[in-house]
């Protein structure tokens, strides 16, 4: 089945995107990402060395850009100006790379997005030639505004970053999905494989996660589980689930021709 994720005109086989933080070392990072099957890996530019610090280990030695699509992100940014400045630095470090993940946080406790600053940054970045995938609240109106600005994907949170609380508001996610003309990916809050499957069954185009894999007891094994969950959820969405029924007068096995009837 030729069913690919298309972002900014590029096709990807995997619908699972993964982060690179919180692992014990770069070797574990690489092993988990290999197990996940992810092709897009996101990197926090303010926290991870991809060349800006020559004396420190470079993540790109473990995850070469010719093997993965590197997605720089603005984790740790609380203003539009900080986010724009960070992504311009990333573009320099990655030789003009345009695909980026924008997140502008509202408060350090919840890490909930600051949507006015996110909208402001998105507008600046799109005008500056970036292809913006954007972390946002699960607000259908604001998600549509980001799409209309020109973002190439909208990424509403399922629940708070790092919380592992799963899909808390499936109805808003469905509204965003139904209204969108760009890919919709769940970003933040996934805790285990069933959460990823549910997101895909709702019709999300993909799932981005980090802590759910990196903080698992066995990150490499969890990465493999997430790969399978995303694939299963996507196939279930495409197949179409049976209607929900409170009672069923339609048994699975036919009643005609029963012995003794």
Swiss-Prot record:
GO terms for cellular component: cytoplasm. The active site is at 101 (schiff-base intermediate with dxp). The keyword Ribonucleoprotein does not apply. It is found in: Cytoplasm. Its EC number is 2.8.1.10. The keyword tRNA-binding does not apply. Pathway: Cofactor biosynthesis; thiamine diphosphate biosynthesis. It catalyses: [ThiS sulfur-carrier protein]-C-terminal-Gly-aminoethanethioate + 2-iminoacetate + 1-deoxy-D-xylulose 5-phosphate = [ThiS sulfur-carrier protein]-C-terminal Gly-Gly + 2-[(2R,5Z)-2-carboxy-4-methylthiazol-5(2H)-ylidene]ethyl phosphate + 2 H2O + H(+). 1-deoxy-D-xylulose 5-phosphate binds at residues 162, 188-189, 210-211. Gene3D superfamilies: Aldolase class I (3.20.20.70). Keywords: Cytoplasm, Schiff base, Thiamine biosynthesis, Transferase. Its main location: cytoplasm. One of its GO terms (molecular function) is thiazole synthase activity. InterPro entries: Aldolase_TIM, Thiazole_synthase_ThiG, ThiG. GO terms for biological process: thiamine diphosphate biosynthetic process. Coiled coil: none annotated. It is an enzyme of class 2 (transferase). HAMAP family: ThiG. Belongs to the ThiG family. Homotetramer. Forms heterodimers with either ThiH or ThiS. Catalyzes the rearrangement of 1-deoxy-D-xylulose 5-phosphate (DXP) to produce the thiazole phosphate moiety of thiamine. Sulfur is provided by the thiocarboxylate moiety of the carrier protein ThiS. In vitro, sulfur can be provided by H(2)S. This is Thiazole synthase.
């Amino acid at each position: 089945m030729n069913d690919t994720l298309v972002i900014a005109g590029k096709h990807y086989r995997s619908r699972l995107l993964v982060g690179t933080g919180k692992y014990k070392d770069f070797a574990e990072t690489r092993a988990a990402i290999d197990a996940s099957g992810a092709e897009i890996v996101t990197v926090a530019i303010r926290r991870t060395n991809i060349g800006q610090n020559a004396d420190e280990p470079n993540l790109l030695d473990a995850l070469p850009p010719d093997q993965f699509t590197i997605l720089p992100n603005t984790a740790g940014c609380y203003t539009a100006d900080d986010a724009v400045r960070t992504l311009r630095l990333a573009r320099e470090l990655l030789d003009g790379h345009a695909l980026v993940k924008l997140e502008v946080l509202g408060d350090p406790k919840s890490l909930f997005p600051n949507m006015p600053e996110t909208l402001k940054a998105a507008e600046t970045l799109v005008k500056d030639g970036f292809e913006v995938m954007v972390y946002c609240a699960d607000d259908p109106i604001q998600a549509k505004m980001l799409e209309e600005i020109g973002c190439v994907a909208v990424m509403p949170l399922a629940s708070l970053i790092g919380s592992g609380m799963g899909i808390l508001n499936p109805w808003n996610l469905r509204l965003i999905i139904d209204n969108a003309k760009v890919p919709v990916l769940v970003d933040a809050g996934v805790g285990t494989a069933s959460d990823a499957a549910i997101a895909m069954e709702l019709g999300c185009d993909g799932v981005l996660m980090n802590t759910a894999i990196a903080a698992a007891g066995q990150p490499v094994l969890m990465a493999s589980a997430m790969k399978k969950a995303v694939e299963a959820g996507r196939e279930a969405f495409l197949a179409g689930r049976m209607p929900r029924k409170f009672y069923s007068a339609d048994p699975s096995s036919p009643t005609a021709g029963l012995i003794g009837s």
